[in-house]
C-alpha cells in the first residue's frame, strides 16, 4: 500500500486489500494453507474451456471513500466468457485435499474474486457478473465456488472491503503526513552531543545516503545506540529508506535500543517494536511448545480472523510496542503473540530483533528480505556488537551430525534421520550408511555436495 498525500489517494493491490481485511485462516505449520502456484489450475481451465478462458487480465478501479481516493488494482487470474456469462476467476493450489477447505480458508480468495468481478463489471459495463474460485489439489481433486450477482451487489461488497480497510489507510496516511516529517525534523534527545557521537552519526548518515556500509568501533559509554538510531531516523524522514531494522545478539542490547526508540518517539511519534523469539512468547511452550496447528493450539485456530482488530487497538494505544504490550493484547484477542508481533512490524518504523531474523534461513523475515533486484524496498540495517555476527552465522548455517546416531540406523540410506537436538534438521538423500560408518571422509564429501545445493556452509561430525 502506498499513500499519495498530495492527491489524498491510497494505492493498494487486490491481494493486499483482501489479505488485510478478509484473511480468516488459521495458523497451520503443516502447510495446509492455500499456495500461490496457479499454473496447474490455469492449465486445467484452459484445457476445459479453450478460447473462452483468458488468463491474467489486469483490472483497476478508483473509488472515493471517507475523504480518500482508493485506487485498487491487480491481475485477475482469468476471465471466462461462456454461455453469455462473464466470470472473474481466482485460482489457487492447496497442499492437502480440497475436503479440508473451510469457509474461513476460502474467505480471502472469495474476497479477491468479488473485487475482480466488480472491477470487471465496471470496465465492461456489465449488469450481471459472476465469480469463480477454484481450489486445486490434483486433477481428481478440484473444488469450485461459483456465484453470480448484479453490478450493484458487487459494488456494495467491494465498498465493504474498502470500509474495513480504512483504519489501516489512516495509519499509512499518518506515517506519510505526520511521522516522517517529524522524523526529518527530529531533534537530538539529549542536551549535548559528544564529539564522538557526532563523528559516529556522520559515518552512519554517509553510509545510508550513499548506500554503503560502515563498520564503526567506539569505546563503551560513547552512546552508540542513540548515535546509530538518531541519524537513521532522520534518514528515514528524508526518504532514504522505508524501515529501520536494529539487529542485536543479546536481550540487554535490544532493551537499550527500545529505550532509545522511546526517547525518539516522544518527540517525533515514530513507531518501534521489539520482536521476541518464538520460543519465548509461545503461549503453550510449557505444555506442547510451538505446535502451530488449530488442533494443538486454540490461538492458532482462526488467528488471522481476529488479528485486524488487535492491530488497530495496539497501534492506537502504543507508539513503542514491547513484549508486555504484545502479550496483553494477544491474550485479550486470543491470538498467537509471535505471529501477531510479525504483523505489527508492517506498521512500525523501527524493528528491533535478533540478528537471526536476517541471517538464519529458517527464521528470517520473508516478508521483507525475500525480494531482490531493482524496485525492492530500501531498509536501514543497524547491527549492534557486529563482532558477534561470525559465530552467529556459523551457528545459523551450520549443522551437527553425531556418528552415534548414524550407527543406530544400520546400513539403511540416511534420509531425515540425523536430527541432533537443538539443531537444524539435516537431510542427506541417498548417502549409504555403510560408507559413512567406515569412511567418514565419504560422508564429508557427500555433505559438501549437499552443502552446495542447500547453502549450508559449516558441518561438524561428532564421534
Task: List where the protein language model places each region.
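Mg2+/Mn2+-dependent nuclease catalytic core
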Residues: 61-156
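Metal-dependent nuclease catalytic cores that hydrolyze phosphodiester bonds in DNA/RNA
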Residues: 1-81
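Alpha-helix boundary/capping motif
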Residues: 417, 436-437, 442, 452-458
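Walker A/P-loop
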Residues: 210-231
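Conserved pre-motif I regulatory segment
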Residues: 175-216
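A substrate-engagement module of RecA-like helicase motors
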Residues: 181, 187, 240-351, 355-359
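Signature of the SF2 helicase/ATPase Hel1-core->accessory helical subdomain module
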Residues: 333-334, 338-350, 355-425, 430, ...
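Walker A/P-loop NTP-binding motif
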Residues: 225-239, 260-263
Amino acid at each position: 500500500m502506498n499513500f499519495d498525500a498530495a492527491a489524498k489517494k491510497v494505492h493498494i493491490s487486490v491481494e493486499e486489500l483482501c489479505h488485510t481485511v478478509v484473511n480468516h485462516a488459521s495458523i497451520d505449520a503443516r502447510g495446509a494453507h492455500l499456495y500461490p502456484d496457479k499454473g496447474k489450475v490455469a492449465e486445467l481451465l484452459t484445457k476445459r474451456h479453450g478460447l473462452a478462458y483468458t488468463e491474467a487480465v489486469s483490472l483497476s478501479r478508483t473509488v472515493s471513500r471517507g475523504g480518500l481516493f482508493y485506487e485498487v488494482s491487480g491481475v485477475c487470474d482469468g476471465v471466462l466468457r461462456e454461455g453469455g456469462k462473464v466470470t472473474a476467476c481466482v485460482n489457487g493450489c492447496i497442499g492437502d485435499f480440497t475436503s479440508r477447505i473451510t469457509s474461513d480458508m476460502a474467505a480471502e480468495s472469495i474476497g479477491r474474486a468479488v473485487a475482480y468481478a466488480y472491477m470487471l463489471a465496471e470496465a465492461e459495463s456489465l449488469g450481471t457478473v459472476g465469480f469463480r474460485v477454484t481450489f486445486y489439489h490434483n486433477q481428481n481433486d478440484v473444488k469450485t465456488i461459483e456465484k453470480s450477482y448484479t453490478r450493484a451487489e458487487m459494488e456494495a461488497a467491494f465498498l465493504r472491503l474498502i470500509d474495513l480497510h480504512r483504519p489501516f489507510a489512516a495509519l499509512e496516511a499518518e506515517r506519510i503526513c505526520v511521522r516522517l516529517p517529524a522524523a526529518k525534523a527530529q531533534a537530538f534527545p539529549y542536551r549535548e552531543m559528544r564529539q564522538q557521537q557526532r563523528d559516529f552519526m556522520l559515518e552512519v548518515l554517509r553510509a545510508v545516503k550513499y548506500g554503503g556500509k560502515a563498520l564503526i568501533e567506539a569505546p563503551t559509554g560513547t552512546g552508540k545506540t542513540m548515535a546509530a538510531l538518531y541519524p537513521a531516523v532522520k534518514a528515514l524522514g528524508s526518504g532514504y529508506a522505508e524501515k529501520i531494522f536494529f539487529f542485536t545478539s543479546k536481550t540487554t542490547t535490544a532493551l537499550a535500543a527500545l529505550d532509545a526508540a522511546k526517547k525518539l518517539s516522544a518527540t517525533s511519534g515514530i513507531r518501534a517494536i521489539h520482536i521476541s523469539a518464538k520460543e519465548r512468547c509461545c503461549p503453550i511452550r510449557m505444555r506442547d511448545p510451538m505446535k502451530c496447528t488449530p488442533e494443538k493450539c486454540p490461538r492458532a485456530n482462526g488467528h488471522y480472523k481476529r488479528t485486524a482488530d488487535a492491530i488497530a487497538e495496539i497501534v492506537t494505544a502504543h507508539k513503542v510496542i514491547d513484549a508486555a504490550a504484545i502479550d496483553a493484547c494477544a491474550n485479550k484477542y486470543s491470538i498467537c503473540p509471535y505471529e501477531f508481533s510479525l504483523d505489527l512490524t508492517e506498521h512500525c518504523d523501527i524493528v528491533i530483533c535478533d540478528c537471526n531474523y536476517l541471517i538464519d534461513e529458517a527464521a528470517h523475515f520473508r516478508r521483507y528480505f525475500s525480494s531482490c533486484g531493482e524496485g525492492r524496498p530500501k531498509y536501514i540495517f543497524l547491527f549492534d556488537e557486529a563482532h558477534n555476527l561470525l559465530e552467529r552465522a556459523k551457528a545459523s548455517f551450520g549443522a551437527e551430525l553425531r556418528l552415534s546416531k548414524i550407527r543406530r540406523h544400520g546400513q539403511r540410506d540416511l534420509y531425515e534421520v540425523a536430527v541432533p537436538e537443538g539443531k537444524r534438521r539435516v537431510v542427506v538423500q541417498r548417502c549409504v550408511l555403510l560408507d559413512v560408518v567406515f569412511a567418514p571422509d565419504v560422508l564429508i564429501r557427500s555433505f559438501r555436495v549437499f552443502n552446495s545445493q542447500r547453502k549450508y556452509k559449516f558441518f561438524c561430525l561428532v564421534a
